């Protein structure tokens, strides 16, 4: 049976910004200040264009602040052959930045849900991970945000999210433990209430 596309309002709007965004020139000057603070000379040849490059890179790295998750999740499909079992998208690569030190977080996300009459396009799940990843984050918060946005928009029987990531704030500084990763999970609905469904999710993620 052909899918029927419907639009629904969803969760995950762009975060509120307390103040007006600084100008490009102000952002570039802030980079020059940091370079001087680090002991560098922003006027030397190799650093002349660095402020502009950093500002451009940050606009890309933090593009999630410009995007609204509900715009991604607002379109769902009905009448997909009566399918009502687990939908899992695993090994979604992502990067984010630690909100405490503004250094990278690199990992993979695994996202599953149990449909209740509607399903999402598979690319939409990966897109949600990307949007939340391209913001300053803690891994715990990002895990919960992904689950909550799908839960509130799709209204499935349950959502399961697992993130496995390495934090450069632990690898490059502080305790300097390269290769250590952090695992977080978030469950809603049936996944939260039924341990057997949690085990099934974990098994599906790990089976290759």
From Swiss-Prot:
It comes from the Bacteria. One of its GO terms (cellular component) is cytoplasm. It catalyses: GTP + H2O = 7,8-dihydroneopterin 3'-triphosphate + formate + H(+). Zn(2+) binds at residues 98, 101, 169. One of its GO terms (molecular function) is GTP binding. Keywords: GTP-binding, Hydrolase, Metal-binding, Nucleotide-binding, One-carbon metabolism, Zinc. GO terms for biological process: one-carbon metabolic process; tetrahydrobiopterin biosynthetic process; tetrahydrofolate biosynthetic process. Pathway: Cofactor biosynthesis; 7,8-dihydroneopterin triphosphate biosynthesis; 7,8-dihydroneopterin triphosphate from GTP: step 1/1. Gene3D superfamilies: 1.10.286.10, 3.30.1130.10. Its EC number is 3.5.4.16. Belongs to the GTP cyclohydrolase I family. NCBIfam families: folE (TIGR00063), PRK09347.1-2 (NF006825), PRK09347.1-3 (NF006826). Toroid-shaped homodecamer, composed of two pentamers of five dimers. This is GTP cyclohydrolase 1. It comes from Agrobacterium fabrum (strain C58 / ATCC 33970) (Agrobacterium tumefaciens (strain C58)).
């Amino acid at each position: 049976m052909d899918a029927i596309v419907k639009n629904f309002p969803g969760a995950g709007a762009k975060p509120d910004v307390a103040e007006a965004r600084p100008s490009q020139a102000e952002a570039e000057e802030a980079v020059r200040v940091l370079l001087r603070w680090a002991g560098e000379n922003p006027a030397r040849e190799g650093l002349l264009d660095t402020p502009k490059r950093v500002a451009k890179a940050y606009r890309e790295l933090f593009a999630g602040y410009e995007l609204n998750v509900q715009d991604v999740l607002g379109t769902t499909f009905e009448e997909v052959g009566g399918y009502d079992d687990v939908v899992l998208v695993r090994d979604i690569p992502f990067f984010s930045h630690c909100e405490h030190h503004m250094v990278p977080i690199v990992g993979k996300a695994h996202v599953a849900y149990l449909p209740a009459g509607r399903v999402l396009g598979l690319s939409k799940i990966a897109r949600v991970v990307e949007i939340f990843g391209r913001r300053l984050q803690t891994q715990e918060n990002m895990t919960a945000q992904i689950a909550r946005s799908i839960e509130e928009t799709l209204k499935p029987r349950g959502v399961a999210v697992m993130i496995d990531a390495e934090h450069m704030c632990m690898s490059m500084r502080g305790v300097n433990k390269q290769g250590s990763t952090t695992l977080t999970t978030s469950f809603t609905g049936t996944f939260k209430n039924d341990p057997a469904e949690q085990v099934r999710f974990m098994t599906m993620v790990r089976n290759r």
